[in-house]
A protein has these predicted regions:
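Short, flexible helix-coil linker/hinge segments at the edges of structured domains or between repeats
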Residues: 116-130, 205-249, 277-290, 332-336
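Outer-membrane beta-barrel "beta-signal"
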Residues: 27, 491-503
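Long, internal scaffold/assembly segments composed of regular secondary structure
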Residues: 234-374
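Transmembrane beta-strands of outer-membrane beta-barrel proteins
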Residues: 57-63, 100-105, 157-163, 200-204, ...
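Outer-membrane beta-barrel translocator domains and adjoining extracellular loop/strand segments
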Residues: 71-78, 114-120, 171-179, 213-220, ...
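Transmembrane beta-strands of outer-membrane beta-barrel pores
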Residues: 63-71, 107-111, 152-156, 165-169, ...
Length: 503
């Protein structure tokens, strides 16, 4: 028995030692895929600093399938899930020690299921000023994305520019036949200056947004009214019904300020300030402006970090969003023209989200990182007259881990796991039922039921990369899955499969 134990122990030792020798993951893959990079997501919005993000070149071409399904819609306007197919190419190239370029191109197609009370694209961006009906249904989607940037360093000065473009088409082939076409263009320019120990950066962003939207009915017996929504179940009654041809004009600007340690160790700060506006216009009424949504944002990220063989970051995140909505009071038509009598600010929405974060990890034979987050969020909405209110506040926590290791002589295995919990602290909904469409009251109560619920979130991912011969090419496969469990006894499931090559 002792001899057998010695043989087993010796065998396990040999396997462990062999695995340790071979367990060195691909260094380029690790640099570009490690969870530590999430800490720099805000910093890299300055293209001058994005140009210094990586020391190595990396490109990836992949196809993917994403499946999401909810047992009941948490938000009626977003539906119960989607099936999306995507092909995407990403690249980051070092042209020299002082310059780099990066880019992305993707095409996505698929279907959203069981959408109600929403006949536009980009619901989260434009709500509450949307076109909506009670029937809804599935929608087909197409999206094209093109992004590209360039950065260079001259002496102690870093300069960079970036362009991001999105075109999207969403439509339905049965009544009510909604069709929305979106174009979204963003331009960024940034600079940074190297001092003895810090990088001081500043960047500006300009955005132009447009969406055309219309709803048609092919069967006269199937016509239902399209509502012009104005917030918390309120409806602009005068222009609801047959005003189904709209477009949204919008855009805005943002300013980014950055302070980053040059050697990876020290205090850091990222500040974002921005304003955007989106106007809803009735195309069929001689381009009559109906409403305008203002969105102001301020974001702060500040803390201390140390990177190297051992990574550690402790920092705070805080975000404030103020959304105000103006409605135009319109007079009687005169020669097919509608005079605007006055403009009233009727919708107000304030969002605060603050969290404390810590990230710790090591990069030696393998790379692993653990991230922890604890935060507080409150969302207050108000419609002025007749008064409507919806207030929600919650605390949340999240724990995530990532492990990257070599597997065999040419393989790299990446595993990630995330768990989170969202706990409702306080919630309130007040709607004047007498002055509200019955179906809209039902919709608002449904959404509020899930807005004030508690949620438990679990997600996992596994990815394997395998080198091809002696070249820098590798092929990979990735599988992601997760579930969100709601205290209202409903849940969401998520599954994604991705296959591709890297070089």
């Amino acid at each position: 028995m002792n001899i057998q134990l010695r043989h087993i122990t010796t065998l396990l030792y040999i396997i462990a030692t062999t695995s340790l020798v071979a367990a060195t993951p691909d260094s380029v893959l690790t640099e570009h895929q490690q969870a530590w990079n999430l800490l720099d997501a805000e910093t890299w919005k300055n293209p001058a600093l994005h140009g210094q993000a990586f020391k190595t070149a990396y490109s990836q071409l992949a196809i993917s399938l994403d499946l999401t399904d909810q047992t009941e819609a948490f938000t009626l306007q977003k539906g119960t899930g989607s099936t999306l197919y995507d092909i995407e190419a990403d690249t980051y190239l070092r042209l020299s020690d002082h310059s780099s370029v990066w880019g992305k191109a993707s095409y996505m197609t698929g279907k959203n299921r069981n959408i109600k009370w929403n006949s536009v694209s980009d619901y989260e961006l434009l709500e509450p000023y949307i076109l909506a009906d009670t029937m809804g249904g599935n929608t087909e989607r197409e999206r094209y994305v093109f992004e590209g940037g360039y950065a260079a360093k001259v002496g102690s000065v870093l300069m960079g520019g970036e362009m991001l473009f999105r075109a999207e088409h969403e439509y339905r082939t049965i009544d009510p036949r909604m069709r929305a076409i979106v174009t979204d263009l963003t331009l960024r320019g940034g600079v940074a200056y190297e001092t003895g120990t810090y990088l001081l950066g500043a960047a500006a962003e300009a955005n132009i947004y447009k969406q055309t939207d219309n709803v048609t009915f092919y069967r006269e017996t199937g016509v239902i009214p399209e509502f012009q929504m104005t917030g918390l179940g309120a409806i602009y009654v005068r222009f609801s019904g047959e005003v189904n041809n709209l477009y949204f004009n919008g855009g805005g600007a943002q300013l980014y300020l950055n302070v980053q340690p040059r050697n990876g160790q020290g205090l850091f700060t990222n500040i974002t300030i921005g304003e955007h506006r989106y106007e809803r216009i009735a195309a069929s009424l001689n381009s009559l402006p109906l409403t305008k949504l203002y969105r102001e944002e301020a974001k702060l990220q500040a803390g201390w970090r140390k990177s190297g063989k051992t990574d550690l970051a402790i920092y705070a995140d805080a975000q404030y969003i103020c959304r105000l909505g103006d409605e135009n009071m319109v007079g009687s038509s005169q020669s097919n023209s509608y005079p605007i009598l006055t403009t009233l600010t009727m919708y107000k929405n304030n969002i605060i989200d603050a969290s404390m974060n810590m990230v710790y990890g090591q990069r030696q034979h393998s790379s692993w990182h653990i991230a922890m987050k604890v935060g507080y969020m409150q969302n207050h909405e108000k419609y002025v007259e007749p008064e409507r209110k919806q207030n929600v506040s919650r605390i949340y926590s999240q724990l995530s881990a990532q492990y990257i290791t070599g597997l065999g002589k040419k393989g790299t295995l990446t595993c990630a796991l995330t768990g989170g919990y969202h706990k409702n602290l306080d919630s309130q909904l007040s709607i004047p039922v007498v002055n509200t469409e019955k179906a809209a009251v039902k919709m608002q109560n449904h959404n509020f039921r899930y807005l004030k619920a508690d949620y438990t979130v679990v997600n996992a991912q596994i990815r394997y990369d395998y080198g091809i011969g002696t070249s820098r090419y590798a092929m990979f496969g990735a599988l992601s899955g997760g579930a969100t469990f709601c205290s209202e006894s409903e849940y969401e499931q998520y599954l994604a499969v991705k296959l591709g090559i890297t070089f």
